[in-house]
Amino acid sequence: MSLYYEPDPANENDPPLLPPILTPIPVVKDVDVFAKAIAVAGKSETGTVLYSENPEYVEVAIILSPEVPKIKCNQMLYILMVAAGDAIGALAPPEVAVTYAFPGFIFLNRGEAGFVKIEVAPSTDDKSIPDWMVVGLKLRLNNNIEICEHEINADITSLADEGGG
């Protein structure tokens, strides 16, 4: 039995059900979640998860407290890319190819679907341990971009376009 079992589907207005070490904080639709997380990182608890209430995107930013020097913190970018790919793989059909490109782009069947970002607290030395770090993900759920009929942009896709939503 799991601690996180839900007998009924979650209500759309309920906050996400996360492990106790993580604290979800909603961010209104038109605010940049990553920028907000950076702004509050110095005074927030480790494990604070800011998420957008915008239904068009999965947009999250997680505030962390690194235990390694600043130069090694960049490894979290790749960890978040792979974690996002694993989550997409659980939702999308098996024939959907999930690929990545530096610096943090996520592609579904060669179409750009999202990206991951990282920001580390400013410090003077790459060998010092930063006070905080923010990792963020933005993934397009629906492709509701207004497109002129003569300008089809096949380079942009979404989870729904690829059969995963």
Where are these regions (language model features)?
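Long, positively charged amphipathic alpha-helical accessory segments at protein N-termini or as interdomain linkers
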Residues: 2-46, 66-93, 111-165
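N-terminal, Lys/Arg- and Ser/Thr-rich interaction peptides
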Residues: 45-59
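A generic structural motif
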Residues: 59-60, 138
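Polybasic, glycine- and aromatic-enriched phosphate-binding surface used to engage nucleic acids
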Residues: 62-64
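Catalytic palm active-site di-aspartate
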Residues: 98-110
